[in-house]
């Protein structure tokens, strides 16, 4: 990430926010953390069936407004800054009906209560009773609709025990679908194992998300791409896909543009956590089994000192 005005604030809050995400202290920091994201640009992913507005939040989070083009009904993913969501809803002149919460950490679910006060009657979905303002608890393969869009809930426990990813598609459409992965799968990375194991993350990445169509758009919860790719380069220094993606991501960061979305097919070429079956990744980890490789490279990533280049 390029840090300009307020860079000290951003660095401090990035570290502090990660700790608070699992300690329940986020609400006390929410107002402070808006200091801020205005150097990061919104992005609209436009398709015939749906429009997805990427909304930067806090220091490196993303919220997402999903608009069904047929009905102009909308859902929002992880609305930690409710006022920004409301402004975007008004800009697009759509009807917000649904909140999709990936997990209970404050930087994802911390805006739910305020949003439902601003917009009474919202349906709030999630897989964990710790999620604020929850109205509909979902489990693996639960389904719901947003206008004419179909949403399938995918249980991916590990970062948190109740983590849900949301696979959004349009029945009968040939356009690529999208999966909102929260803190399970990032561009070139994955979430920390706060409440789970390497085996659970392996299943989440390879057996649940990895079996979705290859052209599925991966839409994640944070802008971590450059740092993730620097670790991927460390794991596989000879991987040209990593090198090319890193150069591209640095250019995007330099002008404040998102590196999201990627696709599942792309993730299998440069994401070391999706590549734990590859010999190059296993050799780096000193392992021969994908799950123990997952455990080893996650531990290494947790201690990795990101180079400044």
UniProtKB/Swiss-Prot annotation:
Pfam families: HAGH_C, Lactamase_B. Pathway: Secondary metabolite metabolism; methylglyoxal degradation; (R)-lactate from methylglyoxal: step 2/2. The modification N6-succinyllysine is found at residue 230. Its cofactor is Zn(2+). The keyword rRNA processing does not apply. Binds 2 Zn(2+) ions per subunit. The keyword Metal-binding applies. It catalyses: an S-(2-hydroxyacyl)glutathione + H2O = a 2-hydroxy carboxylate + glutathione + H(+); (R)-S-lactoylglutathione + H2O = (R)-lactate + glutathione + H(+). Monomer. HAMAP family: Glyoxalase_2. Thiolesterase that catalyzes the hydrolysis of S-D-lactoyl-glutathione to form glutathione and D-lactic acid. This is Hydroxyacylglutathione hydrolase, mitochondrial. The gene is Hagh.
């Amino acid at each position: 990430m390029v840090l300009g005005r307020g860079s000290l604030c951003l660095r401090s809050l990035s570290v502090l926010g990660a700790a608070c995400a699992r300690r329940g202290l986020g609400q006390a920091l929410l107002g402070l953390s808006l200091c801020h994201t205005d150097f990061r640009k919104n992005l609209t992913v436009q398709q015939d069936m749906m429009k997805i507005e990427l909304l930067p939040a806090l220091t490196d989070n993303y919220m997402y407004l999903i608009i069904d083009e047929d009905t102009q009904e909308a859902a929002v993913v992880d609305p930690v800054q409710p006022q920004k969501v409301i402004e975007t809803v008004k800009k697009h002149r759509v009807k917000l009906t649904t909140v999709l919460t990936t997990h209970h950490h404050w930087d994802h679910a911390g805006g739910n209560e305020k949003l439902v006060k601003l917009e009474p009657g919202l349906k709030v979905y999630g897989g964990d009773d710790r999620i604020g303002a929850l109205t509909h608890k979902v489990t693996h393969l639960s389904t719901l609709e947003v206008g004419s869009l179909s949403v399938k809930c995918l249980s991916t426990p590990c970062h948190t025990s109740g983590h849900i990813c949301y696979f959004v598609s349009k029945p009968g459409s040939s356009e690529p679908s999208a999966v909102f992965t929260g803190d399970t799968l990032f561009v070139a990375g994955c979430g920390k194992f706060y409440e789970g194991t390497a085996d659970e993350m392996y299943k989440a990445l390879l057996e649940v998300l990895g079996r979705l169509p290859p052209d599925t758009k991966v839409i994640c919860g944070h802008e971590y791409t450059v740092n993730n790719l620097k670790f991927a380069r460390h794991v596989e220094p000879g991987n040209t896909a990593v090198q090319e993606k890193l150069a591209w991501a640095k250019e995007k960061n330099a002008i404040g543009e998102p590196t999201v979305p990627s696709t599942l097919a792309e993730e299998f070429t440069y994401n070391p956590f999706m590549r734990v079956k590859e010999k190059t990744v296993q050799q780096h980890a000193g392992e021969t089994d994908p799950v123990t490789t997952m455990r080893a490279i996650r531990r290494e990533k947790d201690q990795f000192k990101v180079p400044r280049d």
